[in-house]
Regions:
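Conserved catalytic cores of very large enzyme subunits
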Residues: 1-206, 223, 227, 231-359
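Contiguous, well-ordered alpha-helical segments that form the cores/surfaces of helical PPI scaffolds
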Residues: 210-223, 243
Length: 359
């Protein structure tokens, strides 16, 4: 970019997204994967793995299992994953089961919920999100003193505050003209408006979303039940919390349909420490909650917990599905440079289990 940052973009590697260009898509995907495997020299002349663009490899019927038409391309993707921990994996099967369509996220993990135009055609490109307001779930849990009923009362209040933040963001755009960013609003990146047109016209017509995020589900469940959400009791509460969040946003959309609320599994890359500091300052040191220096990403299982990679995906997949605004699950492994076969087995499990994941 003009200020020297890596563009925060993703490349969608969905072979059958446009069937008439399938062969061309395969050639492009092959080249992207070969380039990622080769790596890029940094300023010191050392070959390194570039962070962006993110590569998103879509697993489908034609490339997941041995014998499928493009399995050779998946083997190349697995080689890239083994060496570069990229591409990420999107399951066409699971996404279609849940959303009816398969489509890419924006950047790393922010998905746009399905939106159809006046002709009932889904739109996935030329859309965007107006911003995210994230809720610190453990804060509500600690404020409740361990009373689950009180926790949900407090969570409801915080959701209402987040709704107001989203509404404010939308209203701040009222009266903003297309001339503020011609390449976006006048020249076709998003729309082709006249310079004096309000951008809200395009935002409404193209189904932009506003997002409420959440983080620290693990700490919340652990504080309220004393158990991880890998246990039956812990998971039942975790699932109930996720359903409550999703249903609350669905109710918001009934009364404010123009805002198109979506639930986002906040990654906590920049705010994890800040949220943790606020918890510790307010509630003191609480074992396994405020004593770590971080709170756990979205719905994820605690990174310190010993768990099989396949089981981790099994559990987290059930929680990921609530996050219509996007979320990603990770698994951590030992170096797999010489074990592409194991990567391929993980790919198969991801295809059958979870929408979006990475190694």
């Amino acid at each position: 970019t003009t200020n020297g940052q890596s563009p925060f973009i993703s490349v969608c590697m969905y072979i059958s997204e446009e069937p008439e260009y399938e062969k061309e898509a395969v050639m492009l995907i092959e080249e992207f994967l070969n380039q990622r495997i080769a790596g890029m020299k940094n300023e010191y002349g050392v070959v390194a793995t570039q962070t962006f663009p993110k590569l998103l490899y879509f697993l489908d019927e034609n490339n997941t299992y041995p014998g499928s038409e493009y399995y050779w391309l998946t083997e190349l993707a697995a080689k890239s994953t083994a060496l570069r921990m990229n591409p990420d994996i999107v399951s066409v099967k699971k996404m279609k089961e849940i959303h009816g369509y398969a489509f890419p996220p924006m950047g790393c993990r922010a998905f746009l919920s399905v939106f159809k135009d006046k002709d009932d055609k889904p739109i996935f490109y030329g859309r965007g999100n107006l911003g995210v307001c994230s809720i610190n779930l453990p804060y509500a849990a600690l404020e409740s003193g361990g009373d689950v009923r009180k926790f949900f009362d407090i969570l409801g209040q915080k959701l209402e505050l987040a709704r107001q933040v989203c509404e404010l963001r939308y209203e701040k755009l009222r009266g903003v003209k297309a001339s503020i960013a011609p390449i976006l609003w006048q020249h076709g990146a998003i729309a082709r408006l006249n310079p004096d047109d309000d951008i809200l016209k395009a935002i409404d017509e193209r189904g932009f979303t506003v997002t409420i995020g959440y983080s620290g589900l693990y700490e919340t469940v652990k504080y309220l039940t004393g158990k991880s959400h890998t246990t039956k009791e812990g998971f039942e509460l975790a699932e109930f919390i996720m359903r409550y969040l999703r249903d609350s946003l669905a109710n918001f959309k009934i009364y404010q349909p123009h805002l198109r609320f979506a639930l986002y599994g906040t990654p906590q890359e920049s705010t994890t420490g800040w949220f943790s500091e606020k918890l510790k300052a307010k509630f003191g040191v609480i074992e396994d909650i405020t004593d770590k220096g971080w709170i756990t990403n979205s719905y994820h299982i605690d990174i310190r917990e010993e768990i099989d990679a396949f089981e981790k995906l099994n559990i987290e997949s059930k929680l990921q599905n609530f996050s219509t605004g996007g979320a990603v699950s990770y698994i951590e492994t030992n170096p797999m440079y010489d074990n592409v076969a194991a990567v391929l087995k993980l790919y198969e499990h991801m295809y059958e289990t979870i929408i979006y994941s990475e190694i």
